Amino acid sequence: MKIVKISPRGYCYGVVDAMVIARNAALDKSLPRPIYILGMIVHNKHVTDAFEEDGIITLDGPSRLEILDKIDSGTVIFTAHGVSPEVKQRAKEKGLTTIDATCPDVTKTHDLIEAKKAEGYHVIYIGKKNHPEPEGAVGIAPDIVHLIERADDLKTLEIPTDKILVTNQTTMSQWDVQHLMEDIQKKFPTAEFHKEICLATQVRQEAVAKQADVADLTIVVGDPKSNNSNRLAQVSQEIAGTKAYRVADVSEIQLEWLQGVENVAVTAGASTPTPITKEVIAFLDQYDPMNPATWERVRKVPLQKILPRVKVKKEQ
């Protein structure tokens, strides 16, 4: 079996920055304990499990405000997906120490929404409902931001001004966003468009679109909650025309997927630890359908190998 290692793949700078911020927090003895992450720091359970070993507690729930209600003391880390001003204010009122690990690309979108609100605009925001990134973006100005996920959402959308800005969740499929923007243009011809697909998401999607078409199958390594991982599988199937499966790690690979497969492409979401992806590639590389000794699919990567290394500051 030939392995097509799609490049680029895996971690983006926003994810690495967020994890380094959280690791440094774990090592900082001056921070009030306990230390919580408000939601998953990035959408990967292997990462959150590794942080649990570091003594950082991940709390998840329907919304950031509801999660925050569970916390009465200590330190709170805001995830790479960003949070609303209301969440920041609530944390301040509760006397919590806060650390912001918001991805710079997400912050840029928040700043854009604030600027356009000041100019009297309404904002159409293309994103996934119940995902933390749109939750934070809508929370910047809930009175003028309208979340849409699909074309059907436009049917009932009415906006009381011609001053309209259209932007989007950074991890969406660029093709889906483009199609929705075309639909929006038809209904709101005066709308201004500001596509915010982050560069890391864009180049990973384009790599799959261009490189997966030579494969019989694409394996996307990523957490089920990772929107960008799910979009990579979608791009493989809809743009490259190659059947795709998303797996959290090697243990989720089904042998029947590999029947008759000669070329398999492998990519990974922006929040997927590199050792987890390498383990998937190693399994596929040695797999022989005629040799049961090569069929074992067990994740063996230790949690201490999941997180990026940080330098421990020496005490003065």
Curated annotation (Swiss-Prot):
Belongs to the IspH family. GO terms for biological process: dimethylallyl diphosphate biosynthetic process; isopentenyl diphosphate biosynthetic process, methylerythritol 4-phosphate pathway; terpenoid biosynthetic process. The keyword Metal-binding applies. Isopentenyl diphosphate binds at H43, H81, H131, S226, N228, S271. This is 4-hydroxy-3-methylbut-2-enyl diphosphate reductase. Its EC number is 1.17.7.4. It comes from Bacillus cereus (strain G9842). Pathway: Isoprenoid biosynthesis; dimethylallyl diphosphate biosynthesis; dimethylallyl diphosphate from (2E)-4-hydroxy-3-methylbutenyl diphosphate: step 1/1; Isoprenoid biosynthesis; isopentenyl diphosphate biosynthesis via DXP pathway; isopentenyl diphosphate from 1-deoxy-D-xylulose 5-phosphate: step 6/6. Dimethylallyl diphosphate binds at H43, H81, H131, S226, N228, S271.
